[in-house]
Amino acid sequence: AWPAIYAALGSVYVNGFPVIEGLLNAVHLDHLIELEVSEDELLKHTGERIELTSWADDYFESASGRVVTIHVTHTAQDGTLLANETERFAIRGRAYSDALPPEAPDYGGIEAEIESTPRRLLRRVKVVAPHEMTAFARTSGDFNPIHTSHRGAAVSGLAAPLVHGMWLSATAQYAVQALDEKGAHYEIAGWTYNMYGMVQLDDEVEISIERVGRVAHAGMVLEVTSRIDEILAADQGA
């Protein structure tokens, strides 16, 4: 989806000039996705071409920079709406307000009655981040040079490229959905991913999956936390 996301991001103008001057200026704040079909229905479209439609809301000023919200719909060839996606970016160096950006909707924005439960650890795994990000860039379409180029990373004051934030999101989702030794797994209907830190190449990341609530009449509410020495990302799934 990333070519469509970046195209929408580049469509936002301020006083006749693009709001983004380059990908190195864009800080990815959060990622939301809500499935509109079941996992079984989604798998029926494996191998098909998926049509993406993207657009941007008007920017708003915040203490984090100018915040731009991008929306993407994922539609199958037969017209079935598969998923709604939302991405938010802050444009660095353009902070004209002391207001904090509003928090992203929980659980991918799904509308459901949710009840809190005692917190319970369901899974904990450790993964090692890739040694370099070219393969993920080719798969996702996200060729932001801060992730794929040592020179691009150096322009941002970094010693080496950073791991894609969306690599960690995908890895956390896989940890939730993977089969355990008993053949059990969890199906994700909505997902909110908030990023709080950077993952370096070859970092070892601990991913903890906890139940924190339940959806009325069906399903659980999960909180997924990724950390090295501190919390790097917090995910909410339902």
Give the location of each predicted region:
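Hot-dog-fold acyl-thioester-processing enzymes
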Residues: 1-30, 96, 100, 105-107, ...
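HotDog/MaoC-like acyl-thioester-processing domains
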Residues: 29-124, 199-238
